[in-house]
């Protein structure tokens, strides 16, 4: 049922509503200014025809024109109604008018402005849209402009209207200067490169600018260089040369790229000679090999392209004489550039470190065959290199400079160079000493022997003011008189060219200055010996010994004692003994062996045998533990040769007490073997018994086999039983040594059982003992497997009153002629004894073996 509402004529057209609308109408009449009531009514009428719904919105907005909710829903609904219509449809204009009416009251609402602007953009009405954006910016407070500009900029970029976009971006940058990169990118895309370069230069010079894209200042600078260098015809408002050169001083780690950009700018501008000047300036100023490589490669590519362009032009237009000359000039210039590369690279390295001696030598080698350049290079090098900052030996430059003059026959110039070198304040005395030695060698090469001696004597002359060799506060000229290098050369020359007295004076002076080495002392003594001054040579040794301590004095003592013995033999035996005692006093164990052997040899040849034995005995105590075994072997050998093998018994006993278990075991075997050869079977057996205490049957099977063979040859059943008893006792002893088992576990056990060190850091105490216990059980099982099968005999109790004669008689009855040997340790129980009492055999409890209680 349709009801016609009665309203005044002024409110026509008449409102038509249905019966279902009456409750909402009544509610509105009661609360006509309630937004919620109108929204409930509108929600109810969502399915009604669009005109009815629009009419309802209009009624509500007439009463509530400042309601944002109503306007927002109304405008959204009106836009949705025309969404699929053509933009030329008059309905679009109605919707636009609705928006305009809304902004009379809602001009401070950015959401409505954004929706309206987007709606206009969809219609394609550029001017109307632009003006609406401007109205929105004017209407809204500046704090809300950031909501409008993104859509505004998108609108500006969507149309090919660069002037409009530029004006809009300029306004936007006043609000958001940090978005300059976006504007620059737009300018590049619209080919307005001049303004883009200006903006980019402004950004680069602004230290407070922070790139939204995360670019560094250098990256922005590099973009600017690429932009202005690659577009010289479009960038007119900036001084490109000044900008790039400013970057050269600002970004010193990227000089290569900046120089190439500057040259590229001139190349694209057509100023080829200017570009070539830039390249030449660059390769003479860059400081790193990387920058040099970039500039040089770009320079070479430029020259190649110029040659290729010239050849192409000549081939198209025909060759002329001028073209040929120009082409040859370009080719010659390119070849010269390539040939200069090593020298230019060397210049770069020298600019990095002008005090690098090796690089100066390489530079001289690059000028090979050009004497004038070599002289200039050497002159520049010796003037540039500071000896206190030099890398390498600075004196080699002076020496090589003089050698160059010498090789070219200019000896006077070479002498002048070396003379100047002797006045240079080097950092090290060795440098000046090397120069003086080169002065002497120069004269020797040209057979000016007297002049060479004169120069070296001058070098070693005492200065007016004495100084210590390592006193850095004194110039090296005052310290060179203590240089062993100069004195050694002077001593060699004096030996070859001088007199005996002059040579002796030189060596004495070296010893007085306390700069001699053991070799110098030995050379001096040998020199005196060659001239038959034996006592003087011994005095030289004595002076050398007073200068040095062990171990440096070792060679002097060895040579001195050898020479003394060869000279006097046994004629001055007491003096020789005193010398040996003096040498051995304070001698480290490492060097004692040689001296003791030499001392013992002296006593054997010229002294007393008992003295020699005493020396050997002292030697066994004085040498290092690692050398004691060898020393005992020598001692035993010499004692056997001098006194006989019986005299070595005491030596063997002492060696067994002193040496380690391994060496003591070998000594015991040799000792026992000697006693066997002497027929002392009981002594040999006692030695085997003593040695068995340090021989684990599991690891020293060779010893037990040797003892077994010995008993087979020389023993009887009782001795065999005793050996087996000792073996069981020793094995039981080793089985109860926990520390030994741990070491054996580390050596012998494989990965199956693991080691104590394999336990986790948190596992300790009982876990360690469990692991050792497992290993002990495994070793016991292995020993059980290694034993031969036991005889099926029973355990008997033997009466204690049975005499030894009865036992022996029974043994003979069982086996009258043969001794039964077996591998089993318990075979001695197989023979039945008289008056035996049969006992029942039971298993031994596991607790007897002493294993730890398990958790």
Swiss-Prot record:
HAT repeat residue numbers: 15-47, 48-80, 90-122, 124-158, 160-192, 198-230, 235-268, 270-305, 369-407, 498-530, 532-566, 571-605, 643-677, 679-713
Signal sequence range: none
One of the GO BP terms on file: blastocyst development
Stretch list, region Disordered: 808-855
Main location: nucleus
High-level lineage: Eukaryota, Metazoa, Chordata, Craniata, Vertebrata
A Pfam family annotated for this UniProt entry: HAT_Syf1_M
InterPro entries: HAT, HAT_Syf1-like_N, HAT_Syf1_central, HAT_Syf1_CNRKL1_C, Syf1-like, TPR-like_helical_dom_sf, TPR_rpt
Residue positions, PTM Phosphoserine: 851
Gene deletion effect: Complete embryonic lethality before 13.5 dpc. Already at 3.5 dpc, the number of homozygous mutant embryos is lower than expected.
Keywords for the protein's UniProt record, in alphabetical order: Acetylation, DNA damage, DNA repair, mRNA processing, mRNA splicing, Nucleus, Phosphoprotein, Repeat, Spliceosome, Transcription
Protein name (record): Pre-mRNA-splicing factor SYF1
Positions of post-translational N6-acetyllysine modification: 420
Biased composition (Acidic residues): 820-834
Location in or out of the cell: Nucleus
UniProt record similarity statement: Belongs to the crooked-neck family.
GO cellular component: nucleoplasm; nucleus; U2-type catalytic step 2 spliceosome
Function: Involved in pre-mRNA splicing as component of the spliceosome. Involved in transcription-coupled repair (TCR), transcription and pre-mRNA splicing.
Subunit structure as annotated in this protein's UniProt entry: Associates with RNA polymerase II, the TCR-specific proteins CKN1/CSA and ERCC6/CSB, and XPA. Identified in the spliceosome C complex. Component of the XAB2 complex, a multimeric protein complex composed of XAB2, PRPF19, AQR, ZNF830, ISY1, and PPIE. Identified in a pentameric intron-binding (IB) complex composed of AQR, XAB2, ISY1, ZNF830 and PPIE that is incorporated into the spliceosome as a preassembled complex. The IB complex does not contain PRPF19.
Superkingdom of origin: Eukaryota
């Amino acid at each position: 049922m349709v009801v016609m509402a009665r309203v005044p004529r002024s409110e026509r057209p008449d409102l038509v509503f249905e019966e279902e609308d009456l409750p909402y109408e009544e509610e509105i009449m009661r609360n006509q200014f309630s937004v919620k009531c109108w929204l409930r009514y509108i929600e109810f009428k969502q399915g009604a025809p669009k005109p009815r719904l629009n009419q309802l919105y209009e009624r509500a907005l007439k009463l509530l024109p400042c309601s944002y909710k109503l306007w927002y829903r109304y405008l959204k609904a009106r836009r949705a109604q025309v969404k699929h219509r053509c933009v030329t449809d008059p309905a679009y204009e109605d919707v636009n008018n609705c928006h305009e009416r809304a902004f009379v009251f809602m001009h401070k609402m950015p959401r409505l402005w954004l929706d309206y602007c987007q709606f206009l953009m969809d219609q394609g009405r550029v001017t109307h849209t632009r003006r609406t954006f401007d109205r929105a910016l004017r209407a809204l407070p500046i704090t809300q402009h950031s909501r409008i500009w993104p859509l505004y900029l998108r609108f500006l970029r969507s149309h090919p209207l660069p002037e409009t976009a530029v004006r809009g971006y300029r306004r936007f940058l006043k609000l958001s200067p940090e978005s300059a990169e976006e504007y620059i990118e737009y300018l590049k895309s619209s080919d307005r490169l001049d303004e883009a370069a200006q903006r980019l230069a402004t950004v680069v010079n602004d230290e407070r600018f922070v790139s939204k894209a995360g670019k560094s200042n250098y990256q922005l600078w590099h973009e600017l260089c690429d932009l202005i260098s690659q577009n010289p015809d479009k960038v007119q408002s900036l001084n490109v040369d000044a900008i790039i050169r400013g970057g050269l001083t600002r970004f010193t780690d990227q000089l290569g790229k900046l120089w190439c950009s500057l040259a590229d700018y001139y190349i694209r501008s057509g100023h080829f000679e200017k570009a070539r000047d830039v390249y030449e300036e660059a390769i003479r100023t860059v400081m790193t090999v990387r920058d040099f490589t970039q500039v040089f490669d770009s320079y070479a590519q430029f020259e190649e392209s110029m040659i290729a362009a010239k050849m192409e032009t000549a081939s198209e237009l025909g060759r002329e004489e001028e073209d040929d000359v120009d082409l040859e000039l370009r080719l010659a210039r390119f070849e010269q550039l390539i040939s200069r590369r090593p020298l230019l690279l060397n210049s770069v390295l020298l600019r990095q470190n002008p005090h690098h001696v090796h690089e100066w030598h390489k530079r001289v080698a690059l000028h090979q065959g050009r004497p004038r350049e070599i002289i200039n290079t050497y002159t520049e090098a010796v003037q540039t290199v500071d000896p206190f900052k030099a890398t390498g030996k600075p004196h080699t430059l002076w020496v090589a400079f003089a050698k160059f003059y010498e090789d070219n026959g200019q000896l006077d110039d070479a002498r002048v160079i070396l003379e100047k070198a002797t006045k240079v304040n080097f950092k090290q005395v060795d440098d000046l000493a090397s120069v003086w030695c080169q002065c002497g060698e120069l004269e020797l090469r040209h057979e000016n022997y007297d002049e060479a001696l004169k120069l070296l004597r001058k070098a070693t002359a005492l200065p007016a003011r004495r100084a210590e060799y390592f006193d850095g506060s004194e110039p090296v000229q005052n310290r060179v008189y203590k240089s062993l290098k100069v004195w050694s050369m002077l001593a060699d020359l004096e030996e070859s060219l001088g007199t005996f007295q002059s040579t002796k004076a030189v060596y004495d002076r070296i010893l007085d200055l306390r700069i001699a080495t053991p070799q110098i002392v030995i050379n001096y003594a040998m020199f005196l010996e060659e001239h038959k001054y034996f006592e003087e040579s011994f005095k030289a040794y004595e002076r050398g010994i007073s200068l040095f301590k062990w171990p440096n004095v070792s060679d002097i003592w060895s040579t001195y004692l050898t020479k003394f013995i060869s000279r006097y033999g046994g004629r001055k035996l007491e003096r020789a003994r005193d010398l040996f005692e003096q040498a051995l006093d304070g001698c480290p164990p490492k060097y004692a062996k040689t001296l003791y052997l030499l001392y013992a040899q002296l006593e054997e040849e010229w002294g007393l045998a008992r003295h020699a034995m005493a020396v050997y005995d002292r030697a066994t105590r004085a040498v290092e533990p690692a050398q004691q075994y060898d020393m005992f072997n020598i001692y035993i050998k010499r004692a056997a040769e001098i006194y006989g093998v019986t005299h070595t018994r005491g030596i063997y006993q002492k060696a067994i007490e002193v040496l380690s278990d391994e060496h003591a075991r070998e000594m015991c075997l040799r000792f026992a073997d000697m006693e066997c050869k002497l027929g002392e079977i009981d002594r040999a057996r006692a030695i085997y018994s003593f040695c068995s205490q340090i021989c684990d049957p599991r690891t020293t099977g060779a010893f037990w086999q040797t003892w077994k063979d010995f008993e087979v040859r020389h023993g009887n059943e009782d001795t065999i039983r005793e050996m087996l008893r000792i073996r069981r006792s020793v094995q039981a002893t080793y089985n109860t040594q926990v520390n030994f088992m741990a070491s054996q576990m580390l050596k012998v056990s494989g990965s199956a059982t693991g080691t104590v060190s394999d336990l986790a850091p948190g596992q300790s105490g009982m876990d360690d003992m469990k692991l050792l216990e497992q290993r002990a059980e495994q070793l016991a099982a292995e020993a059980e497997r290694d034993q031969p099968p036991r005889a099926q005999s029973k355990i008997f109790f033997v009466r204690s009153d049975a005499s030894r004669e009865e036992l022996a008689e029974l043994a003979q009855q069982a086996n009258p002629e043969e001794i039964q040997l077996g591998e089993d340790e318990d075979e001695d129980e197989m023979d039945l004894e008289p008056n035996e009492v049969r006992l029942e055999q039971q298993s031994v409890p596991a607790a007897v073996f002493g294993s730890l209680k398990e958790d």
